[in-house]
């Protein structure tokens, strides 16, 4: 009683190494009360048989009746008072597997997942992370124009509000938090033995970071085209550049 939860679907065939069922099944945020939880569970199960879901099964040579579904009920992290986002243990654009990519924006993570907002982005060097060196090699301040929060005037609902210009100019995630998330992502990748697509949330009350979902990355993970080359600059050239002020 009095605990807000997320009711999330998870199918046995979802997120296999060959196909990702991301977004095919229903999930619900900020749900409270036994009757509402049961109703949202029913809708999650029923979402296996939508036209979209059945079509996706057939496109990937899977029979819909060969699938089963689990529905996870998990306590909501109060990311509406902080931030949330996504994390890929592979570059989502190039497929380069030597980096971790983090996207972060204010509020619940749905707007980041759906691509509605432009999040802050961070690129983390995996090898540097493993060696205990400062691993953030690049970060970009996103627009973060909107955020999804609890609707205090309506039970069991969320809504979208505008973010102030001052808040948009700030980083939604600190460097230390970014490194902590990347360490979690690396552990998850090592455990599953493959690049992962992860969703995370920061609780604005406890300031804790939570992993709320992890699935195999299915777009670039099977490609071996991307490579990273390391070059060591000659010490004489380094000294000359410093002397010249470059």
Placement of each model-derived feature along the sequence:
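Conserved mixed alpha/beta core segments that line enzyme active sites in large multi-domain catalysts
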Residues: 1-246
């Amino acid at each position: 009683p009095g605990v807000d939860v997320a009711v999330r679907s998870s199918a046995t065939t979802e997120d296999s190494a060959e196909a990702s069922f991301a977004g095919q099944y229903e999930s619900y945020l900020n749900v409270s009360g036994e009757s509402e939880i049961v109703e949202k569970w029913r809708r999650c199960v029923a979402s296996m048989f939508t036209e979209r879901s059945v079509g996706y099964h057939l496109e990937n040579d899977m029979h819909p009746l060969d699938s089963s579904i689990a529905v996870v009920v998990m306590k909501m992290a109060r990311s509406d008072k902080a931030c949330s986002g996504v994390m890929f243990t592979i570059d989502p654009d190039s497929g380069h597997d030597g980096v971790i990519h983090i996207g972060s924006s204010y509020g619940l993570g749905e707007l980041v997942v759906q691509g509605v907002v432009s999040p802050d982005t961070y690129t983390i060097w995996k090898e540097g992370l493993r060696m205990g060196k400062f691993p953030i090699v690049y970060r970009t301040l996103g627009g973060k124009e909107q955020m999804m929060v609890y609707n205090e005037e309506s039970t069991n609902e969320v809504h979208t509000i505008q973010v102030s210009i001052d808040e948009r100019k700030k980083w939604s995630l600190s460097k230390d938090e970014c490194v902590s998330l990347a360490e979690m992502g690396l552990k998850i990748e090592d455990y599953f033995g493959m690049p992962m697509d992860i969703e995370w949330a920061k609780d604005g009350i406890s300031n804790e970071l939570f992993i709320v979902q992890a699935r195999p990355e299915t777009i670039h993970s099977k490609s071996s085209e991307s490579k990273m080359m390391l070059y060591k600059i000659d010490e004489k050239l380094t000294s000359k550049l410093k002397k010249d002020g470059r």
